[in-house]
């Protein structure tokens, strides 16, 4: 049965309510103390676990304590320091390039708009939304693999394209819940709605999910 917008919105509100009860302490799992550190951490997290990234960050931020330090780092040395995170050569170029752009174009401060953020080397909508929501308090949703999979299973999204999903979800969920929703869905995807072995019988959303395995 095709749901109308009122029914979809009501189901979305209930999903948020149940997830908040299940994951009251959900938050960004990357460790950072300022917007630039989160930018670096998010670049490193591509195709890498947050746990592995967090293992690398303390020594990395000790070696490069500022935007300027990253901007003028020795690229080969930086690449080796982030080697455990994978794709180290490309990530090093992105980190240095974005840091240099922040120095040259933004006075050493991470910009606070989507338009300016996605102009930085290595920064896409996912990283930009993470920074906007976490550091600057703007309503935003990070569309990662968990969000793509679970929102399609819940039939709140009908695409695999992150930007299209982001726009679809903005129409469904209350703006006040966007940032928190991302973290709760990620936690749910790691703990219960696991890609290859979803534990539907343990899922708090099983009565609301059209894709539940009975």
Task: State where each predicted segment sits.
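Catalytic cores of DNA base-excision repair glycosylases
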Residues: 2-214
């Amino acid at each position: 049965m095709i749901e109308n917008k009122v029914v979809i919105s009501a189901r979305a509100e209930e999903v948020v309510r149940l997830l908040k009860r299940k994951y009251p302490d959900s938050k960004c799992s990357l460790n950072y103390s300022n917007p630039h550190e989160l930018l670096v951490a998010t670049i490193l997290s591509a195709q890498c676990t947050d746990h592995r990234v967090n293992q690398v960050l303390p020594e990395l931020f000790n070696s490069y304590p500022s935007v300027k330090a990253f901007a003028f780092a020795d690229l080969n040395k930086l690449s080796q320091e982030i080697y455990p995170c994978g794709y180290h050569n490309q990530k090093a170029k992105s980190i240095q390039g974005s840091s240099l752009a922040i120095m040259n174009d933004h006075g050493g401060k991470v910009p606070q708009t989507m338009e300016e953020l996605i102009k930085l080397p290595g920064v896409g909508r996912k990283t930009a939304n993470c920074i906007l929501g976490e550091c600057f308090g703007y309503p935003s949703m990070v569309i990662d693999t968990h969000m793509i999979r679970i929102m399609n299973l819940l039939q709140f999204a009908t695409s695999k394209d992150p930007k299209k999903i982001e726009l679809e979800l903005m129409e469904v969920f209350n703006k006040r819940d966007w940032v928190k929703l991302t973290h709760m869905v990620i936690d749910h995807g790691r703990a219960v709605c696991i890609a290859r072995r979803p534990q539907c019988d343990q899922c708090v959303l099983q009565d609301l999910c059209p894709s539940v395995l009975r």
